[in-house]
Curated annotation (Swiss-Prot):
Phylogenetic lineage: Bacteria, Pseudomonadati, Pseudomonadota, Betaproteobacteria, Burkholderiales
Cofactor needs: pyridoxal 5'-phosphate
Protein name: Alanine racemase
Residues where N6-(pyridoxal phosphate)lysine is found: K35
Record InterPro entries: Ala_racemase, Ala_racemase/Decarboxylase_C, Ala_racemase_C, Ala_racemase_N, Ala_racemase_pyridoxalP-BS, PLP-binding_barrel
PROSITE patterns with a match to the protein in the record: ALANINE_RACEMASE
GO CC field: cytosol
One GO BP annotation of this record: D-alanine biosynthetic process
Function statement: Catalyzes the interconversion of L-alanine and D-alanine. May also act on other amino acids.
EC number: 5.1.1.1
Active-site residues per Swiss-Prot or TrEMBL entry: K35, Y261
Keywords: Isomerase, Pyridoxal phosphate
Pathway: Amino-acid biosynthesis; D-alanine biosynthesis; D-alanine from L-alanine: step 1/1
Record's keyword annotation contains DNA-binding: no
Amino acid sequence: MPRPIQATIHTAALRHNLARARLAAPDAKVWAIVKANAYGHGIERVFEGLRAADGFALLDLDEAQRVRALGWRGPILLLEGVFELRDLELCSRLDLWHTVHCDEQIDMLASHKTKVAQRVFLKMNSGMNRLGFTPQRYRAAWTRLNALPQVDEISLITHFSDADGARGITEQMAVFAEVTRDLPGERTLSNSAATLLHTPARQPGDGFVASDWVRPGIAIYGSAPDFPQHSATDWGLQPSMTLTAKIIATQTVDTGASVGYGSTFVADKPIQVGVVACGYADGYPRLCPTGTPVLVNGIRTRTVGRVSMDMLAVDLSAVTAAGGQVGIGSEVTLWGRAANGLVLGIDEVAQPAGTVGYELMCALAPRVPVLVAD
């Protein structure tokens, strides 16, 4: 019998969240971001739920080949571009669009022997200082690309560092707008946070530059890009991944007794504890402290003690106080939607561990069985 733990990918939630992104940017086309194996969900598992997107944006050629193998004939964008010259041949063969963010990538294009000109997205470093040409060098890079016969069309791209924070996008937007004001080509600027928070209606003072394409990532997987200011529910998003496990043992813990490695939890009254078949080897964060929320049979309660490699412990007091029956075999929702419909947002689990929902999704371990359901 398999170990009682399972992740479920919700196709209907993916469809819903993609539609929610479109609602926020009705005049833009939508890149569905499926990098990092679709944020840990699995590209093949999310494809049906996201196939209404206008394009798929991802990181490397392997992911691009997987999307093409699923039958997708629309646009695919390599967000970091190519890493070596021979990658350009596969870009031609698979009809991929790719980002250009450095002189070396322009050099590769210039030396690439092809009869098929390629579409590129020229990246500006508008303030994040990660990838892209500085504003001072951006137009020179555009001019150089525009002179290459290997290049068909140049689109313009940047990435916001603080779309989810107090600093916002005003400064970066102004820099991008000034440098690109008379350059042709489609623009793509907005990630999940910018798409949801910084629409013309919500932020009229931002010096808004419309995106021809928006790039929702975390939002299409049902996590709030600006948690805890807003929850996923506030944004009308639904969890695309649920992680459940079952109680495999129970213990009565007396006053003064401890639970788990390091005795980090000591009971101040007698409690019943459930031992759950999930640990950090499954992708649940070891740093989640006592008090991290969980759902047991759809009733909200808390973890107690330190998370082990294969197990964690939960306080069953709230469940029994609510009149619920609980014991070995009871279902525990670590994040996502419980059988009774109650949702535990992945962000609520990530925050006590000092991380973000993105990391929990990406950290789902290969040993966890995954079911795709509508």
